[in-house]
Amino acid sequence: MRFKTLLIFTSAAMAAVVTTPLFAQKTKPGNTPKIVNIVNFIRDIEPRDASITKDVLYQTVVNQIALMKQYHLGGTFLLQYDALIDKRYQDLLKTLPKDEFEIGGWWELPQPLIEKAGIKWRGKYAWDWHSDIGFSVGYTPAEREKIIDVYFADFKSIFGYYPKSIASWVIDAHSLNYMYDKYKIVASANCKDQVGTDGFTLWGGYWNQAYYPSRLNAYMPAQHADKQLPVPVFRMLGSDPIRQYADGSSVTTLEPVYPHAGGNEQWINWFLHTFANDSSLGYNYTQAGQENSFTWDAMKKGLEWQMPVVARLRKQGKVRVETMAQSGEWFKRTYKVTPATTFTVSRDLANSDKKTVWYNSRFYRTNLLWENGTLRITDIHLFNETVPDKYLNNVTTVNQSFFYTLPLADGFQWGKRGKPEGFRLMMNDGGGEAPVQGGDPVFTNLNKTTAHASWPVGKGSFEINMGEKSLTITAENHPAGDWFLDLCIAEGAKTPFKQLTGNSALYEFDGHTYRLAMQQGTLEKSANGSLYRIRPQHHRVVLLLADQ
């Protein structure tokens, strides 16, 4: 099993070898904020490997702190309960400057916490990583409240205040509601999107940055302020905007223990340069760090590459480095509802011509991917605040937990590993159907909620607007004669698509019926193996992307 990582939230001041306090950081005028959180979470034991002793785990945290201080980078340390009650960690963390470092809670549930809450321990070890034992989804709502009360009371008795930030791979809505309503937490975080890794599936959510969750579903962004929990949930681990989606079960993130990603100097420089310099709508965010279970030897090289880059970017005014609570408080001051955001890549790693944009709003998310001169809309998921998560009132009894939204196009799950499918932009070229071929897209922002991609094709272009509730594609100056979108899937792929009804496509997923409706353009059946085809009207298609 892969050990999970600590958060690093990244902002428009991600790098500076200066002693300026975090709150004094500035971003360059006109730049959207780029926020980095460095988040390390701490476990007290590692029962799966006898060589990873308590001393090894403790020294890992000592080294993390030393490296962060070397580059004058603050951050957040999240304590699992067994580490919270270990006096060595208490004494160590109490020495950290409060204006640069934050102490919060890591919401995995070890034996001492469960038993102090008066609940029988069912685990094999004192820390058991299985979903039904070590996480809130394995306990009833009443048990969750007892567990929360014990943790928060003991945290306050040790540090003198309640934690402001609580994070975990997965947290249910009941627990988050209770933590906010009673203890007023200001920030949370959950795992990146993934399928099945370590028993956790989170798929189709707000892809990066942060969102206000529905009171009924901690993974689902709310559409209305009166239905949302006013605690921003940040997405963890710094996912590669191109490879992490295509390889949904693997790990291509800022985590420094992975030699192809966060432990690779070339990848680190590419990712952080892209993050800091490419266009973003609203703001951009990333998380870095690693849990101590991986040990210092495994993470040392990656962190020693990452930290000076973050410090340099902060000094240049391109990123902000903040604690998780600082980012949460900024988010709440800035946004009354979940904002629209993008993460764009205008230049991939060497030997790849891929470009991409992830767009998120409180109504949907989408991903556009350019490869070999062609365009594919790999992903569209709708959000609906009335759809509860599976664990709002129920528990999981297996070592798996599942959090989904509502898929209209799911290129990863409906394609093949490493080769996502989705809506392909096609044309009739006289000799048959072929992908439209074009140049490099240019990403800009039209306003606070609308991102734009301009894709040159022939003597014309396709102009793509991603708005809060709609996606518009317009052909300017006849870039391609007879063009259309085909929703392609791999042979044998199972999808929730049911049928075309009028000018909409009907879907049913997890007992919820929803649809893709057309404001402009027409839907028709396709004879080439795709689910259906979208044809333009007057050179334009407009997809309505709000679940009604």
Regions found by a protein language model. Give the residues of each.
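Active-site beta->alpha N-cap acidic-glycine motif
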Residues: 26-99, 285-287, 358
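Catalytic grooves of carbohydrate-active enzymes
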Residues: 43-46, 59, 63-66, 153, ...
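Catalytic domains of cell-wall/extracellular-matrix polysaccharide-remodeling enzymes
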Residues: 140-215, 469, 473
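Metal-dependent polysaccharide deacetylase catalytic core of the NodB/CE4 family, i.e.
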Residues: 81-170, 225-252, 281-294
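Acidic-aromatic substrate-binding/catalytic surfaces of carbohydrate-active enzymes
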Residues: 368-450, 458
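Acidic-and-aromatic substrate-binding clefts and catalytic sites of carbohydrate-active enzymes
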Residues: 50-58, 78-90, 111-114, 167-176, ...
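Beta-strand-rich recognition/accessory modules
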Residues: 259-266, 286-289, 485-488, 508-548
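Acidic, contiguous internal or C-terminal segments within carbohydrate-active enzymes
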Residues: 449-496
